[in-house]
A protein has these predicted regions:
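Hydrophobic N-terminal alpha-helices or hydrophobic patches in metabolic proteins across all domains
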Residues: 1-177
Length: 177
């Protein structure tokens, strides 16, 4: 059985052009995440708050982030994308958070083939409301679970590229030697 985290070609995962794996469709409340052993999606929980994911949410294969998981990605798209779909994207920014006392970075990405969004090249170009929805969601989505999340910083494309490169290198060091 294929494990989408590991078995996608490294040629398809570059800092400026990568395939994201969607775990949660925009508008969803069910929190799915990668089961690292099988490569399947596993339901982690239903969100306790009345909020829903403001964008398609997933990960970048062949990356390893500081939290021990593949690097998280929010894909801004005019359509809801089905879980376990691959979508070719480019990064426009990053949200840096603290989640449960640990660093947690979320890349903001755009599909190459979505004409509604593919004119945006940096998070600073987004309409403010789009970013405000994402920020609000990540600051409250665990509140009723009595867990604290804090947004520390939002950065543009160049910082996102650096984080992706680091997570690709960390993955390579951990799994490809």
């Amino acid at each position: 059985m294929m494990n989408i985290w590991h078995d996608i070609s490294p040629n398809r995962i570059k800092d400026e052009d990568f395939f994201a794996v969607i775990e949660i469709s925009k508008g969803g409340k069910a929190k799915y995440e990668l089961d690292k052993e099988t490569g399947m999606l596993m339901m982690d929980r239903i969100l306790h708050t009345s909020t829903h994911y403001p964008a398609n949410y997933g990960f970048i294969p062949r990356t390893f982030a500081d939290d021990g998981d593949p690097l998280d990605v929010l894909v801004l798209c005019s359509e809801d994308i089905l879980p376990l779909s691959l979508i070719r994207c480019y990064p426009i920014g990053v949200i840096r958070m603290i989640d449960g006392g640990e660093k947690d970075e979320k890349i903001i990405a755009i599909p190459f083939k979505d004409p509604t969004y593919n004119t945006f090249k940096d998070i600073s170009e987004l309409p403010p409301h789009i970013f405000n929805e994402m920020s609000h969601f990540f600051s409250v989505y665990k509140e009723l679970e009595h867990k604290v999340t804090t947004i520390e910083e939002v950065s543009g494309r160049e910082d996102a590229l650096q984080i992706i490169r680091t997570c690709i290198d960390t993955y390579s060091d951990k799994f490809c030697k």
